From Swiss-Prot:
GO terms for biological process: translation. GO terms for molecular function: structural constituent of ribosome. Keywords: Ribonucleoprotein, Ribosomal protein. This is Large ribosomal subunit protein bL27. One of its GO terms (cellular component) is ribosome. Belongs to the bacterial ribosomal protein bL27 family. It comes from Orientia tsutsugamushi (strain Boryong) (Rickettsia tsutsugamushi). PANTHER family: LARGE RIBOSOMAL SUBUNIT PROTEIN BL27M (PTHR15893:SF0), RIBOSOMAL PROTEIN L27 (PTHR15893). The gene is rpmA.
Length: 89
């Protein structure tokens, strides 16, 4: 006769995969039209000039240029894409 009961399987021990959120491009980096700049949940970053806001709050470039981060109000960080003559092809 066994002195220990058979060990049952654990009800824990699983997790979902990460959602790959966050910055995809940083300040000063060159982007093409359509490039994703930030993937986020909610609006941690707000769209500025030449960027779009997707339905899942993804910020993406509408034109080719350089990424620029700036603050307008105290707690709001905006992201714009500055069209540079040297980057225009």
């Amino acid at each position: 006769m066994a002195t220990k009961k058979a060990g049952g399987s654990s009800k824990n021990g699983r997790d979902s995969a990460g959602r790959r959120l966050g910055l995809k491009k940083t300040d000063g980096q060159l982007v093409n039209a359509g490039n994703i700049i930030v993937k986020q949940r909610g609006t941690k970053f707000y769209p500025g000039k030449n960027v779009g806001l997707g339905k899942d709050h993804t910020i993406f470039s509408l034109v080719s240029g350089k990424v620029k981060f700036f603050r307008k109000k105290k707690n709001r960080v905006f992201i714009s894409v500055v069209v540079d003559d040297s980057t225009a092809a």
